[in-house]
């Protein structure tokens, strides 16, 4: 994690990783971030081959900060995660835990837009990172084979480009549940 690289022992960790890479024991070095601002320091400290970061229709910070484009231009692979915001974006409206009620406007609009346009939530969620040429990989979690097959099918649906900007939030309590 980034915090381990940014503390006093960070330089020793980076040196050890670089030695492993120079010996051919490690092919690529990557970092997993929670906030694109972490990259401000990390890119100065080490040569990064892969960045794993959250990216979804609510948390677009990697793209809007300009880091997605910068990483791509520098040949750094971007692997995105939290595509479904820890599953919240796939839950029926009534199943979203009450601790997320303060964002009810977002959930209500999301539910209405999906219903109004006859859209599948998984397809919409996957279409955002998959539509970005700067994204190398989209990481998703699955519980079983049927769910995996369903998500593969959802990822293959070509959706018309739609503006989901009403979903965006910078509230860390929402985007980092």
Regions found by a protein language model. Give the residues of each.
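Beta/alpha (TIM)-barrel catalytic core signal, keyed to glycine-rich beta->alpha loops juxtaposed to Asp/Glu
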Residues: 1-169, 174
């Amino acid at each position: 994690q980034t915090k381990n690289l940014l503390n006093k022992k960070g330089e020793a960790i980076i040196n050890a990783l670089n030695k492993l890479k120079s010996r051919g024991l490690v092919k690529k070095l990557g970092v997993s971030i929670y906030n694109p601002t972490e990259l401000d320091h990390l890119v100065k400290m080490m040569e990064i081959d892969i960045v794993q970061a959250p990216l979804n229709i609510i948390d677009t910070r990697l793209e809007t900060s300009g880091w997605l484009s910068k990483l791509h231009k520098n040949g750094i692979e971007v692997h995105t995660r939290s595509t479904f915001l820890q599953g919240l974006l796939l839950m029926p409206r009534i199943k979203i835990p009450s601790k997320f009620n303060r964002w009810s406007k977002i959930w209500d609009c999301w539910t209405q837009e999906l219903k109004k346009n006859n859209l599948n939530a998984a397809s919409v969620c996957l279409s955002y990172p998959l539509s970005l040429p700067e994204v190398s990989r989209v990481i998703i979690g699955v519980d079983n084979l049927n769910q995996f097959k369903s998500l593969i099918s959802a990822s293959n649906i070509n959706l018309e480009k739609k503006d989901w900007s009403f979903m965006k939030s910078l509230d860390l309590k929402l985007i980092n549940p």
